Amino acid sequence: RHVQGWWADGWDLLLTPTLAAPPLPIGGLYGDQGDGVDPANPMAPSIRSGRFVAFTPQFNASGQPAINLPLHWNDAGLPIGVQLVAAYGREDLLIRIASQLEAAAPWADRHPT
């Protein structure tokens, strides 16, 4: 509800990170990661995943229009995503902005190193 008030105040977009940390290596949600999560707990991957994707679930669950774009790459060549969120019914704005960003900094041919 709080976010919905931003659109009424005249904001066009909300900008958040896609992930709460850089991309994990394969298997990074399993085993002993030294994060206090018991690796024997069958829910350990879900617990870690919830911490990792803290910015996207509320928009997925609510149907709020959002788009995630790979706008930066770290030193390992992994994409760092940015999430843009718009008001209900403003998918057109997200698609236009995404198109402009991709034209300015294409990513289709970028691959992790």
Segments from the language model and where they lie:
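Serine-dependent amide/ester hydrolase catalytic core
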Residues: 1-61, 111
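Structural helix-boundary/capping segments
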Residues: 48, 60-113
